[in-house]
């Protein structure tokens, strides 16, 4: 489908780009619950929704939002792009609602349906030094773990969640 056809038929999705195809299982909306911890804060639980979408280009758009389970009040949001390559490498850029930005690089494994990322750059963050993310599809559920290091704490688990596809 060319750009003119897409403009004329905006409800139709373009074909998935070949670079995106190995990760097409991510496409759609996922919702569930997660929990967070870190030595400097009290543990917490949250609701979460992640959406992965595509435009026919070699990139996956990513949006995420979280909320307090008790009240539904918004907590955190971020958005960005996943750029998979045919060799199994992937680059991810994320902008968080806190102003922090991440450039992550890593790999994806088609057979294991997993993605492993490590920060190449963490910007606009005086205390955060490194962030890693691991995503995995198990029994139709998307799980992830986010690890973080700061100026005072080594890399360790910070967030984890299990999400169901809607």
From Swiss-Prot:
Catalytic activity from the UniProt record: peroxynitrite = nitrate
First-level EC class: isomerase
Pathways involved: Nitrogen metabolism
EC number: 5.99.-.-
Disulfide bridge map: none
Motif (GXWXGXG): 28-34
GO cellular component: cytosol
Major place of residence: cytoplasm
Pfam families xrefs: THAP4_heme-bd
InterPro entries linked: Calycin, Nitrobindin, THAP4-like_heme-bd
GO-annotated molecular function: isomerase activity; metal ion binding
Complex formation: Homodimer.
Protein name per the record: Peroxynitrite isomerase Rv2717c
Organism: Arabidopsis thaliana (Mouse-ear cress)
Highest classification ranks of the organism: Eukaryota, Viridiplantae, Streptophyta, Embryophyta, Tracheophyta
């Amino acid at each position: 489908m060319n750009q003119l056809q897409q403009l004329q038929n905006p409800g139709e999705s373009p074909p998935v780009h070949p670079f995106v195809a190995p990760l097409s299982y991510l496409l759609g909306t996922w919702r569930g619950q997660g929990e967070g911890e870190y030595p400097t804060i009290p543990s917490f639980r949250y609701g979460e929704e992640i959406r992965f979408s595509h435009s026919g280009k070699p990139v996956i758009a990513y949006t995420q939002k979280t909320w307090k389970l008790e009240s539904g009040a918004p907590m955190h949001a971020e958005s960005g792009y996943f750029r998979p390559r045919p060799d199994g490498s992937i680059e991810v850029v994320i902008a968080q609602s806190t102003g922090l930005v991440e450039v992550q690089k890593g790999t994806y494994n088609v057979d294991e349906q997993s993605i492993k990322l490590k920060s190449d750059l963490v910007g606009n963050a005086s205390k955060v030094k490194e962030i890693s993310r691991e995503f995995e599809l198990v029994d139709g559920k998307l799980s992830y773990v986010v690890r973080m290091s700061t100026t005072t704490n080594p890399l360790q688990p910070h967030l984890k969640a299990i999400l169901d596809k809607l």
